[in-house]
């Protein structure tokens, strides 16, 4: 069993309030969870309205499957939000 752990950091300079940011984060996390069957949560910057930190976890049978999933998730985030993806951290763990 392999476990993919990702942390994405996004910058959304046009966001003016935490309420507006939370609407964006909620929409993005729900769409990621539904489309890719992954666990998603806002993990950083809850009190900073211009930055978004999202954690994503998935389990797979091979590293290749998880690397493919990672690329699809990154493409989806870049295509479905106006926020700039500024940092990607990822790790695949053998369990």
Regions found by a protein language model. Give the residues of each.
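Short, charge-patterned binding micro-sites
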Residues: 3-4, 41-61, 93-95
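C-terminal binding/interaction regions
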Residues: 21
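C-terminal structural segments of small proteins and small subunits
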Residues: 61-95
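Short glycine-/aliphatic-rich beta-strand segments at the starts of folded cytosolic domains
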Residues: 4-13, 18
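A short linear hydrophobic-aromatic micro-motif
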Residues: 38-43, 86-89
């Amino acid at each position: 069993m392999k476990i993919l752990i990702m942390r994405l950091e996004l910058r959304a300079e046009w966001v003016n309030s935490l309420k507006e940011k939370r609407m964006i984060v909620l929409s993005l996390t729900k769409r990621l969870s539904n489309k890719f069957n992954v666990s998603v949560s806002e993990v950083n910057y809850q009190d900073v309205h211009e930055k978004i930190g999202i954690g994503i976890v998935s389990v797979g049978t091979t590293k290749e499957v998880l690397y493919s999933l990672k690329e699809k998730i990154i493409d989806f985030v870049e295509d479905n939000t106006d926020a700039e993806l500024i940092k990607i951290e990822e790790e695949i763990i053998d369990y």
